[in-house]
Protein backbone atom coordinates (compact mmCIF):
# COMPACT_ATOMS: atom_id res chain seq x y z
CA UNK A 1 0.00 0.00 0.00
CA UNK A 2 1.74 3.19 -1.14
CA UNK A 3 0.55 6.43 0.35
CA UNK A 4 1.63 9.96 -0.44
CA UNK A 5 1.10 12.40 2.40
CA UNK A 6 0.62 16.07 1.66
CA UNK A 7 -0.54 18.78 4.05
CA UNK A 8 -2.77 21.49 2.62
CA UNK A 9 -1.35 24.89 3.40
CA UNK A 10 -4.66 26.09 4.77
CA UNK A 11 -5.01 23.13 7.12
CA UNK A 12 -4.07 25.00 10.24
CA UNK A 13 -5.69 26.27 13.37
CA UNK A 14 -6.62 29.42 11.51
CA UNK A 15 -8.35 27.49 8.74
CA UNK A 16 -10.13 25.02 10.98
CA UNK A 17 -13.69 26.02 11.78
CA UNK A 18 -15.11 25.76 15.28
CA UNK A 19 -18.72 24.62 15.35
CA UNK A 20 -21.45 24.63 18.00
CA UNK A 21 -20.93 22.18 20.84
CA UNK A 22 -23.12 19.08 20.71
CA UNK A 23 -24.52 17.83 24.03
CA UNK A 24 -21.68 15.40 24.66
CA UNK A 25 -18.96 18.02 24.25
CA UNK A 26 -20.65 21.18 25.53
CA UNK A 27 -18.16 21.47 28.38
CA UNK A 28 -15.91 24.37 29.21
CA UNK A 29 -12.79 22.28 28.66
CA UNK A 30 -13.80 21.05 25.17
CA UNK A 31 -13.74 22.53 21.66
CA UNK A 32 -15.37 20.90 18.64
CA UNK A 33 -14.02 21.80 15.18
CA UNK A 34 -14.03 20.91 11.52
CA UNK A 35 -10.44 20.62 10.30
CA UNK A 36 -9.56 20.59 6.57
CA UNK A 37 -6.79 18.30 5.36
CA UNK A 38 -5.46 17.25 1.98
CA UNK A 39 -4.77 13.56 1.57
CA UNK A 40 -3.45 11.45 -1.31
CA UNK A 41 -3.27 7.68 -1.57
CA UNK A 42 -3.29 4.77 -3.97
CA UNK A 43 -6.66 3.08 -3.54
CA UNK A 44 -7.85 -0.33 -4.69
CA UNK A 45 -9.79 -1.01 -7.86
CA UNK A 46 -13.20 -2.27 -6.72
CA UNK A 47 -14.92 -1.84 -10.08
CA UNK A 48 -17.06 -4.81 -11.04
CA UNK A 49 -16.09 -6.88 -8.01
CA UNK A 50 -18.67 -9.15 -6.43
CA UNK A 51 -18.45 -9.10 -2.61
CA UNK A 52 -19.93 -12.60 -2.50
CA UNK A 53 -16.95 -13.89 -4.50
CA UNK A 54 -13.76 -12.58 -2.83
CA UNK A 55 -10.74 -12.05 -5.05
CA UNK A 56 -7.32 -10.47 -4.43
CA UNK A 57 -7.40 -6.68 -4.62
CA UNK A 58 -5.05 -4.54 -6.69
CA UNK A 59 -3.94 -1.07 -5.56
CA UNK A 60 -3.61 1.02 -8.71
CA UNK A 61 -6.07 3.91 -8.34
CA UNK A 62 -4.50 7.26 -7.36
CA UNK A 63 -6.87 9.31 -5.20
CA UNK A 64 -6.38 12.83 -3.89
CA UNK A 65 -8.70 15.30 -2.27
CA UNK A 66 -9.52 17.85 0.39
CA UNK A 67 -11.49 16.44 3.31
CA UNK A 68 -13.01 17.95 6.42
CA UNK A 69 -12.54 16.01 9.65
CA UNK A 70 -14.65 16.51 12.77
CA UNK A 71 -12.50 16.66 15.90
CA UNK A 72 -13.23 17.18 19.61
CA UNK A 73 -10.38 18.49 21.75
CA UNK A 74 -10.78 18.35 25.52
CA UNK A 75 -8.23 19.85 27.89
CA UNK A 76 -7.46 18.14 31.20
CA UNK A 77 -9.77 18.93 34.09
CA UNK A 78 -7.06 18.10 36.61
CA UNK A 79 -3.46 19.24 36.52
CA UNK A 80 -0.86 16.46 36.33
CA UNK A 81 2.60 17.71 35.42
CA UNK A 82 3.68 14.24 34.29
CA UNK A 83 1.02 14.19 31.55
CA UNK A 84 1.09 17.86 30.49
CA UNK A 85 2.91 17.11 27.22
CA UNK A 86 0.84 14.06 26.26
CA UNK A 87 -2.14 13.98 23.90
CA UNK A 88 -4.40 10.96 23.52
CA UNK A 89 -5.96 10.71 20.05
CA UNK A 90 -8.94 8.36 19.70
CA UNK A 91 -10.96 7.24 16.67
CA UNK A 92 -14.08 5.01 16.49
CA UNK A 93 -15.00 1.86 14.64
CA UNK A 94 -17.45 1.29 11.79
CA UNK A 95 -20.91 2.85 12.28
CA UNK A 96 -19.63 4.95 15.18
CA UNK A 97 -18.59 8.58 15.61
CA UNK A 98 -17.03 10.69 18.37
CA UNK A 99 -19.77 9.59 20.78
CA UNK A 100 -18.03 6.22 21.11
CA UNK A 101 -15.18 7.65 23.21
CA UNK A 102 -17.30 10.26 25.01
CA UNK A 103 -20.72 8.74 25.62
CA UNK A 104 -23.07 11.30 27.23
CA UNK A 105 -25.23 8.52 28.69
CA UNK A 106 -23.95 7.72 32.19
CA UNK A 107 -20.65 9.45 31.34
CA UNK A 108 -19.15 8.56 34.71
CA UNK A 109 -19.18 4.97 33.45
CA UNK A 110 -18.94 5.17 29.66
CA UNK A 111 -16.88 8.28 28.80
CA UNK A 112 -13.19 7.54 28.32
CA UNK A 113 -12.65 11.23 27.51
CA UNK A 114 -13.93 12.44 30.88
CA UNK A 115 -11.90 9.88 32.79
CA UNK A 116 -8.70 10.68 30.88
CA UNK A 117 -9.24 14.43 31.35
CA UNK A 118 -9.77 13.90 35.09
CA UNK A 119 -6.41 12.13 35.28
CA UNK A 120 -4.55 14.98 33.61
CA UNK A 121 -4.58 13.93 29.95
CA UNK A 122 -5.60 16.08 26.99
CA UNK A 123 -7.72 14.18 24.47
CA UNK A 124 -8.57 14.54 20.80
CA UNK A 125 -11.48 12.44 19.56
CA UNK A 126 -11.77 12.33 15.79
CA UNK A 127 -14.51 11.18 13.46
CA UNK A 128 -13.24 9.23 10.48
CA UNK A 129 -13.81 10.72 7.06
CA UNK A 130 -17.29 9.43 6.21
CA UNK A 131 -18.88 9.65 9.66
CA UNK A 132 -20.08 12.26 12.12
CA UNK A 133 -19.75 15.76 10.66
CA UNK A 134 -16.72 14.81 8.57
CA UNK A 135 -16.77 14.83 4.76
CA UNK A 136 -18.67 12.01 3.08
CA UNK A 137 -16.92 11.37 -0.26
CA UNK A 138 -17.59 8.63 -2.81
CA UNK A 139 -18.13 5.60 -0.55
CA UNK A 140 -16.69 3.04 -2.95
CA UNK A 141 -13.85 4.50 -4.99
CA UNK A 142 -12.58 7.17 -2.57
CA UNK A 143 -13.48 6.15 0.98
CA UNK A 144 -11.14 3.19 1.40
CA UNK A 145 -8.46 2.29 3.95
CA UNK A 146 -5.54 3.97 2.12
CA UNK A 147 -7.21 7.39 2.00
CA UNK A 148 -8.36 7.02 5.61
CA UNK A 149 -4.77 6.33 6.65
CA UNK A 150 -3.53 9.38 4.75
CA UNK A 151 -6.20 11.64 6.26
CA UNK A 152 -5.50 10.43 9.79
CA UNK A 153 -1.78 11.01 9.36
CA UNK A 154 -2.50 14.63 8.47
CA UNK A 155 -4.69 15.11 11.54
CA UNK A 156 -1.99 13.58 13.74
CA UNK A 157 0.62 15.91 12.25
CA UNK A 158 -1.55 18.92 13.03
CA UNK A 159 -2.20 17.60 16.52
CA UNK A 160 1.48 17.17 17.31
CA UNK A 161 2.22 20.66 16.00
CA UNK A 162 -0.51 22.20 18.16
CA UNK A 163 -2.59 23.36 15.19
CA UNK A 164 -6.00 22.13 16.32
CA UNK A 165 -8.51 24.65 17.79
CA UNK A 166 -8.32 24.62 21.56
CA UNK A 167 -4.66 23.63 21.69
CA UNK A 168 -2.32 25.89 23.66
CA UNK A 169 0.92 24.58 22.26
CA UNK A 170 2.65 21.51 20.88
CA UNK A 171 2.51 18.05 22.39
CA UNK A 172 5.74 16.12 22.84
CA UNK A 173 3.95 12.76 23.16
CA UNK A 174 1.04 11.56 21.04
CA UNK A 175 -0.68 8.27 21.83
CA UNK A 176 -2.90 6.86 19.08
CA UNK A 177 -5.92 4.81 20.18
CA UNK A 178 -8.15 3.07 17.64
CA UNK A 179 -11.19 0.88 17.83
CA UNK A 180 -12.01 -1.82 15.26
CA UNK A 181 -11.91 -0.18 11.81
CA UNK A 182 -9.93 2.73 13.23
CA UNK A 183 -7.45 0.26 14.70
CA UNK A 184 -6.89 -1.05 11.18
CA UNK A 185 -6.39 2.56 10.07
CA UNK A 186 -3.99 3.17 12.98
CA UNK A 187 -1.96 0.14 11.96
CA UNK A 188 -1.70 1.66 8.49
CA UNK A 189 -0.56 4.93 10.06
CA UNK A 190 2.39 3.35 11.87
CA UNK A 191 3.29 1.44 8.71
CA UNK A 192 3.35 4.55 6.52
CA UNK A 193 4.26 7.34 8.96
CA UNK A 194 5.50 5.82 12.23
CA UNK A 195 6.92 9.14 13.42
CA UNK A 196 3.51 10.79 13.93
CA UNK A 197 2.72 8.90 17.16
CA UNK A 198 4.77 7.65 20.09
CA UNK A 199 2.57 4.78 21.28
CA UNK A 200 -0.20 2.74 19.66
CA UNK A 201 -3.23 1.16 21.31
CA UNK A 202 -5.43 -1.15 19.25
CA UNK A 203 -8.84 -2.15 20.62
CA UNK A 204 -11.34 -4.52 19.05
CA UNK A 205 -8.65 -5.60 16.62
CA UNK A 206 -6.19 -8.23 15.51
CA UNK A 207 -4.27 -8.85 12.29
CA UNK A 208 -6.36 -10.77 9.79
CA UNK A 209 -5.04 -12.87 6.93
CA UNK A 210 -3.33 -10.17 4.81
CA UNK A 211 -4.54 -11.62 1.51
CA UNK A 212 -6.40 -8.46 0.47
CA UNK A 213 -9.73 -10.21 0.17
CA UNK A 214 -13.08 -8.53 -0.20
CA UNK A 215 -15.17 -8.37 2.95
CA UNK A 216 -18.74 -9.65 2.38
CA UNK A 217 -21.14 -6.90 3.43
CA UNK A 218 -24.19 -9.07 2.93
CA UNK A 219 -25.52 -11.29 5.68
CA UNK A 220 -23.99 -9.27 8.54
CA UNK A 221 -26.98 -7.07 9.32
CA UNK A 222 -25.85 -4.10 7.22
CA UNK A 223 -28.20 -2.24 4.89
CA UNK A 224 -27.90 0.87 2.69
CA UNK A 225 -27.94 3.83 5.08
CA UNK A 226 -30.30 5.79 2.85
CA UNK A 227 -32.88 3.01 3.23
CA UNK A 228 -32.67 2.84 7.04
CA UNK A 229 -35.49 5.33 7.60
CA UNK A 230 -33.16 7.70 9.47
CA UNK A 231 -33.52 11.34 8.35
CA UNK A 232 -29.82 12.18 8.72
CA UNK A 233 -28.92 9.37 6.30
CA UNK A 234 -31.67 10.01 3.76
CA UNK A 235 -29.53 11.90 1.25
CA UNK A 236 -26.37 9.83 1.51
CA UNK A 237 -25.19 8.24 -1.75
CA UNK A 238 -25.49 4.51 -2.30
CA UNK A 239 -22.51 2.73 -0.81
CA UNK A 240 -22.86 4.04 2.72
CA UNK A 241 -24.11 1.31 5.06
CA UNK A 242 -25.44 1.06 8.59
CA UNK A 243 -26.80 -1.70 10.80
CA UNK A 244 -30.38 -2.71 10.10
CA UNK A 245 -31.85 -2.52 13.60
CA UNK A 246 -31.14 -2.91 17.29
CA UNK A 247 -31.05 -6.71 16.97
CA UNK A 248 -28.33 -6.63 14.33
CA UNK A 249 -26.40 -4.18 16.50
CA UNK A 250 -26.08 -6.74 19.28
CA UNK A 251 -23.33 -8.42 17.23
CA UNK A 252 -21.02 -5.81 18.77
CA UNK A 253 -21.92 -6.89 22.31
CA UNK A 254 -21.42 -9.83 24.63
CA UNK A 255 -24.31 -11.94 25.92
CA UNK A 256 -27.15 -10.43 27.99
CA UNK A 257 -25.90 -9.38 31.37
CA UNK A 258 -22.64 -7.95 30.03
CA UNK A 259 -24.19 -4.63 28.98
CA UNK A 260 -26.94 -2.20 29.97
CA UNK A 261 -29.94 -2.40 27.58
CA UNK A 262 -30.25 1.40 27.84
CA UNK A 263 -26.75 1.72 26.39
CA UNK A 264 -27.65 -0.56 23.49
CA UNK A 265 -30.79 1.52 22.83
CA UNK A 266 -28.73 4.74 22.89
CA UNK A 267 -26.19 3.13 20.57
CA UNK A 268 -28.91 2.19 18.08
CA UNK A 269 -30.43 5.68 18.18
CA UNK A 270 -27.10 7.39 17.51
CA UNK A 271 -25.44 4.94 15.12
CA UNK A 272 -23.44 6.17 12.17
CA UNK A 273 -22.25 4.70 8.87
CA UNK A 274 -19.47 2.78 7.17
CA UNK A 275 -18.68 2.65 3.47
CA UNK A 276 -18.50 -0.30 1.11
CA UNK A 277 -15.02 0.89 0.20
CA UNK A 278 -13.90 0.71 3.83
CA UNK A 279 -15.38 -2.73 4.34
CA UNK A 280 -13.88 -4.14 1.17
CA UNK A 281 -10.39 -2.86 1.99
CA UNK A 282 -10.59 -3.48 5.73
CA UNK A 283 -7.87 -6.13 5.87
CA UNK A 284 -5.44 -4.48 3.46
CA UNK A 285 -3.57 -2.76 6.30
CA UNK A 286 -3.08 -6.04 8.21
CA UNK A 287 0.64 -5.97 7.61
CA UNK A 288 3.75 -5.60 9.73
CA UNK A 289 4.94 -2.19 10.95
CA UNK A 290 8.72 -2.72 11.22
CA UNK A 291 9.55 1.00 11.42
CA UNK A 292 7.45 1.68 14.50
CA UNK A 293 9.56 1.79 17.67
CA UNK A 294 7.08 2.86 20.32
CA UNK A 295 5.15 0.58 22.68
CA UNK A 296 2.10 -1.30 21.39
CA UNK A 297 -0.96 -2.53 23.26
CA UNK A 298 -3.82 -4.63 21.84
CA UNK A 299 -7.01 -5.07 23.87
CA UNK A 300 -9.97 -7.28 22.97
CA UNK A 301 -13.09 -8.46 24.75
CA UNK A 302 -13.33 -12.14 25.62
CA UNK A 303 -16.70 -12.31 23.83
CA UNK A 304 -15.39 -10.64 20.66
CA UNK A 305 -15.59 -13.71 18.44
CA UNK A 306 -14.03 -11.86 15.49
CA UNK A 307 -10.68 -11.59 17.27
CA UNK A 308 -11.10 -13.94 20.24
CA UNK A 309 -12.36 -17.22 18.81
CA UNK A 310 -11.70 -18.77 22.22
CA UNK A 311 -12.27 -17.29 25.69
CA UNK A 312 -8.51 -17.37 26.24
CA UNK A 313 -8.05 -15.20 23.14
CA UNK A 314 -4.70 -16.87 22.60
CA UNK A 315 -4.59 -15.62 19.00
CA UNK A 316 -3.47 -12.22 20.35
CA UNK A 317 -0.11 -13.69 21.29
CA UNK A 318 0.86 -13.66 17.61
CA UNK A 319 0.45 -9.87 17.37
CA UNK A 320 4.06 -9.34 18.46
CA UNK A 321 5.37 -10.56 15.10
CA UNK A 322 3.79 -7.55 13.37
CA UNK A 323 5.76 -5.05 15.48
CA UNK A 324 9.30 -6.48 15.41
CA UNK A 325 11.03 -3.26 16.47
CA UNK A 326 8.47 -1.90 18.92
CA UNK A 327 9.72 -0.99 22.39
CA UNK A 328 7.23 -3.47 23.81
CA UNK A 329 4.19 -5.40 22.60
CA UNK A 330 1.47 -6.38 25.06
CA UNK A 331 -2.09 -7.60 24.92
CA UNK A 332 -4.98 -7.68 27.37
CA UNK A 333 -8.26 -9.61 27.28
CA UNK A 334 -11.21 -7.96 29.01
CA UNK A 335 -13.41 -10.66 30.50
CA UNK A 336 -17.14 -10.01 30.25
CA UNK A 337 -16.87 -7.75 27.20
CA UNK A 338 -17.70 -8.09 23.53
CA UNK A 339 -16.39 -6.12 20.55
CA UNK A 340 -17.52 -2.67 21.72
CA UNK A 341 -15.39 -2.52 24.85
CA UNK A 342 -16.49 1.05 25.65
CA UNK A 343 -20.16 0.09 25.86
CA UNK A 344 -20.07 -2.83 28.29
CA UNK A 345 -20.44 -2.88 32.05
CA UNK A 346 -16.70 -3.54 32.17
CA UNK A 347 -15.94 -0.16 30.54
CA UNK A 348 -14.50 1.53 33.67
CA UNK A 349 -11.98 -1.26 34.18
CA UNK A 350 -11.11 -1.26 30.48
CA UNK A 351 -10.56 2.50 30.47
CA UNK A 352 -8.31 2.29 33.51
CA UNK A 353 -6.36 -0.52 31.84
CA UNK A 354 -5.55 1.83 28.95
CA UNK A 355 -4.62 4.76 31.18
CA UNK A 356 -2.49 2.64 33.49
CA UNK A 357 -0.59 1.26 30.50
CA UNK A 358 -0.03 4.79 29.17
CA UNK A 359 1.31 5.95 32.54
CA UNK A 360 3.51 2.89 32.94
CA UNK A 361 5.18 3.66 29.62
CA UNK A 362 6.08 7.18 30.68
CA UNK A 363 3.41 9.23 28.98
Predicted regions located by residue number:
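Fungal secretory targeting signals
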Residues: 1-18
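N-terminal cap/lid segment of alpha/beta-hydrolase-fold proteins
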Residues: 19-83
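Alpha/beta-hydrolase active-site loop
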Residues: 141-167
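Alpha/beta-hydrolase-fold enzymes
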Residues: 186-271
Amino acid sequence: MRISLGLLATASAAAARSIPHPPQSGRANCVQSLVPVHASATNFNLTGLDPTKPVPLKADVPVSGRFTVEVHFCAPTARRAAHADTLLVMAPGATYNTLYWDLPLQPETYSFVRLANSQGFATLSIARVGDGLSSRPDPINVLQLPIQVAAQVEILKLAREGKIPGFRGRFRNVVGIGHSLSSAILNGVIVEAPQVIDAAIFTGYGHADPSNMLFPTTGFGFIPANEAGIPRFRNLPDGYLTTQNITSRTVFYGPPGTFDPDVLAFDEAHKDTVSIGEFNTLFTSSVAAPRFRGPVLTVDGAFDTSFCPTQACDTLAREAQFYPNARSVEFVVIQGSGHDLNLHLTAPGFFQTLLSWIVRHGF
